[in-house]
Amino acid sequence: MAAKIISGTELSKQIKANLADKITHYIEQGKRVPGLAVILVGADPASQIYVGNKRKSCEEVGILSKSYDLPETTTQNELLAIIDQLNADKNIDGILVQLPLPKQINAEAIIEHIDPKKDVDGFHPYNVGRLCQRIPTLRACTPYGVMKLLETTGIDLHGKHAVIVGASNIVGRPMSLELLLAGATVTVTHRFTKNLENHVRQADILVVAVGKPNLISGDWIKESAVVIDVGINRVDGKLVGDIEFDKAAEKAAYITPVPGGVGPMTVAMLMSNTLYAYEHNK
């Protein structure tokens, strides 16, 4: 059987169109425009592309983006001072600091300094803690986007065995909490996991977020599994995921492509989080 493609490109367009309608409605009522501050430290080419996509999406939905492009030499205290200003700015609803940061800046200290109500990336320990307590508000964008993609399949996740490959703070760990919240039985694998293949073969739902091209053989995929590939890698000038796509697509019921799968959803959920923060910014 050939897997059905879960298109993040299409779903993200629908989500952004709905957000744009809501924002237009607020502005017609005489309310201010939602505001997102985007901070980029240094000139990492990949980060510049990601930030550019986020700013473009802001324009598409009607969010005012305020840009801070800072030099590589920016100190931690200088960045903290900017965050202090943005935390106090009533016209800014969301604050996004593009990761990774230069080595002289402690990313955890920066994330913890952002007002949790403006943490639209969903990385602040307070927001991760709320998800852990089953009362989520601002949720990590990539896992949140994956949950929206899974919803489109119509599959009931209760009791399904979900296997996550990768245990990062940005994807793997919050992803495990999202899937637990949805009623799945969750296994998280990581670099110390023995016999990765055995775990993958048992997955009804497989989410891979490592950043190693074709790490997961298509032969390992369980028949009729739902396969979500979060990885994005450049190989011979082409973008590929962490999963051997063609072979996996022969066995899976549903699969996300790379590009055009999870990536667009991450940005769409950032826009969604920004509107949520705006609506709750009292």
Swiss-Prot record:
InterPro entries documented for this protein: Aminoacid_DH-like_N_sf (IPR046346), NAD(P)-bd_dom_sf (IPR036291), THF_DH/CycHdrlase (IPR000672), THF_DH/CycHdrlase_cat_dom (IPR020630), THF_DH/CycHdrlase_CS (IPR020867), THF_DH/CycHdrlase_NAD-bd_dom (IPR020631)
GO MF terms held by the record: methenyltetrahydrofolate cyclohydrolase activity; methylenetetrahydrofolate dehydrogenase (NADP+) activity
UniProt pathway annotation: One-carbon metabolism; tetrahydrofolate interconversion
GO cellular component, one term: cytosol
One of the GO biological process terms: purine nucleotide biosynthetic process
Family the entry assigns: Belongs to the tetrahydrofolate dehydrogenase/cyclohydrolase family.
Record's function text: Catalyzes the oxidation of 5,10-methylenetetrahydrofolate to 5,10-methenyltetrahydrofolate and then the hydrolysis of 5,10-methenyltetrahydrofolate to 10-formyltetrahydrofolate.
Record-linked NCBIfam families: PRK10792.1 (NF008058), PRK14186.1 (NF010783)
Annotated protein name in UniProt: Bifunctional protein FolD
Organism: Haemophilus influenzae (strain PittGG)
Gene: folD
